[in-house]
Regions:
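N-terminal, positively charged/glycine-rich alpha-helical extensions of SAM-dependent methyltransferases
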Residues: 1-29
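Class I SAM-dependent methyltransferase Rossmann-like catalytic core
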Residues: 21-46, 51
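Class I SAM-dependent methyltransferase "Motif I" SAM/SAH-binding loop
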Residues: 66-70
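Class I SAM-dependent methyltransferase SAM/SAH-binding core
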Residues: 71, 76-119
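A conserved beta-strand element that flanks and buttresses the S-adenosyl-L-methionine
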Residues: 131
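A short, conserved alpha-helix within the catalytic core of class I
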Residues: 139-150
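Conserved beta-strand signature within the Rossmann-like core of class I S-adenosyl-L-methionine
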Residues: 155-164
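C-terminal alpha-helical "lid/dimerization" subdomain adjacent to the S-adenosyl-L-methionine
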Residues: 164-208
Length: 235
């Protein structure tokens, strides 16, 4: 399954539309747990805070593409203060958006939209920062380039991608230790596929060339994560 020199994009169980709601929620809950334990949320927060630190209270809209149950936006809402910052989660899955709305009830700055992001009219809907966490590895290279081009159209300030590092060491760690801290079979199964479908730094550079970007920044994090920051204001 794991191939060092190329991504192995096998379907994950959680991508199957026939996966029952309870099983899917188990997978989402495990992803949220891993993000909290291994700093996934914090890495995105740090990147966004750096991007907006000189914004001087100007309105900022942050979009989370492939938001799932909205856990990332709830985390950002908790740690980024000010009514001038608004959060919008976009997901193609109706049940994910329904779950996100239920879990985010009472958060006035957070809202969600069920939509295919590729079909959004950017003349009437845009944002300042677009972020996406553990979503990109679900797609093949040509699909990723298509998404990134759309993201560039939407985001006036920057794109922040948070995703996995394709590493034999990470694959081995997860294979042997995930039964200890992950209860659900779907998460153990999909976790290995996710690592095999993840990225090396050279992959991001190929995508950058494909979308005409040369000022991006790729940051490696200790938990086998990459934060990929793509400024979009210098076009």
């Amino acid at each position: 399954m794991y191939k060092s020199q190329q991504r192995n994009c096998q379907p994950e169980w959680m991508d199957d539309p026939d996966t029952d709601t309870v099983t899917l929620q188990h997978a989402v809950d495990d992803i949220t747990k891993i993000n909290r334990l291994l700093g996934g949320f914090k890495f995105t927060l740090q990147a966004i805070k750096k991007l907006i630190k000189n914004n001087a209270g100007k309105p900022v809209t942050i979009v989370d593409a492939g938001c799932g149950d909205g856990a990332m936006l709830r985390y950002l809402d908790q740690h980024i203060q000010g009514d001038h910052v608004q959060f919008i989660g976009i997901d193609l899955s109706a049940r994910s958006v329904k779950c996100a709305r239920e879990k985010s009830e009472g958060l006035s700055r957070v809202r969600f939209r069920e939509s295919d992001i590729l079909n959004i009219d950017t003349s009437i809907f845009s944002c300042d920062i677009l972020t996406s966490t553990l979503t990109m590895h679900h797609f093949k290279d040509e699909q990723i380039v298509t998404f990134l081009r759309k993201f560039k159209e939407m985001a006036s300030m920057a794109i922040v991608i948070n995703d996995l590092h394709r590493s034999r060491l990470a694959y081995g760690f997860f294979k042997y230790f995930s039964p200890i801290f992950i209860r659900h079979e779907i998460s153990r199964h999909d976790g290995l596929i996710s690592i095999a479908a993840a990225f090396k730094k050279a992959d991001f550079k190929r995508y950058s060339l494909a979308i005409g970007v040369n000022n991006d920044l790729v940051i490696w994090k200790w938990s086998f994560r990459y934060i990929w920051i793509i400024p979009t204001h210098e076009r």
